[in-house]
Amino acid sequence: MKRQLITALFCFVIGFFVTANAVAENQKYKLTITGASPGGLWSLLGAGIDSAVRAGYPGSFVTYQTSGGGLANVGIVSKGGAELGIVHNVELKAAVQGSAPFKSPVTNLRAIAYLYNWAPMQLIMNKKFANKYGINNVADLVREKPPVRFAVNTRGNMVQEVNKEILSAYGVSYDDVKSWGGQILYAASKEQGDFLGDGRIDMFGNGVFAPHKSIIKASRVVDVIMLELSVEASQKVANKTGADPYIVKQESYAWLNKDIRTVALGAELVVNDSMSEQIAYDITKTLVENIDKMRGVHKSMKSLTPEMMASQNVIQYHPGAIRYYKEVGLIK
């Protein structure tokens, strides 16, 4: 009798897990992901995430929703306007801190995966200007105090905020730059290269992949250099903004003569903390198991690994994501 009871219990447990797995595999999800403008990398990532979810759960789909970008996506996901959202690490850091442009901390977002962390801040300076003032890195810029015309991106853009924090790491403000006889120009990234080429600025800072066509284009018009951050400054900026310390490799551009230390923007896939643990688990699982669907959307995504997906530290991972990452040994 005892043996029969144990056998029956064993069969029940096995049957339970088989049934649970079958239910999970047969689950169909209809989700929305909010990204940025159509045609950009984030729309491609949205398509890759859709493909991964379809592969893991046939009959499912993820609809891509355009938006104003990561700052807007914080509000959309936190208010339940979409199940999934893509947000830059620096935007997410500002959100959880309640720093500009947010009026108060956003506390109900959770991470599913780090999607990339290789969009480095590249401080590009006209080489003729650099030679005139003996500038090779940001420390030189601060020491020499030249009348530099610095394009920092538009107001409200987080790249502009990172440029501000880079200067701040050396004890310098925008007002200090102006006191040197310089200017701070709020020029969009698509304008910066043209402005450098036609002599309207001496320097710009942008967070884009390396190499990037806008920087290559500018370097064909005027000779340029890239300014390096010190170890201490890069760590200060990383701690303040949520960006990651990063090295731009010498081979990224023909005119670079060494590796350049900086910080990099990244993008994270986030959800509302009200999402069920099982849904978050299933999404995380299928993204890792079908990672090639995301790697294949653009050549810049080929470096994506499961280890990287589990490596962000700006906000907490969703409990469902944690459960999966622990199961496969990606986090302890």
List each language-model region with its residue ranges.
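Immediate post-signal peptide segment of exported/extracytoplasmic ligand-binding proteins
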Residues: 22-33, 105, 139-149, 319, ...
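A conserved helix-loop-strand patch within extracytoplasmic ligand-binding domains
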Residues: 108-156
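An extracytoplasmic/periplasmic, membrane-proximal ligand-sensing/linker region
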Residues: 170, 198, 203, 208-220, ...
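Pocket-lining segment of extracytoplasmic ligand-binding domains
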Residues: 89-91, 99-100, 107, 111-113, ...
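Extracytoplasmic "Venus flytrap"
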Residues: 29-49, 69, 155-159
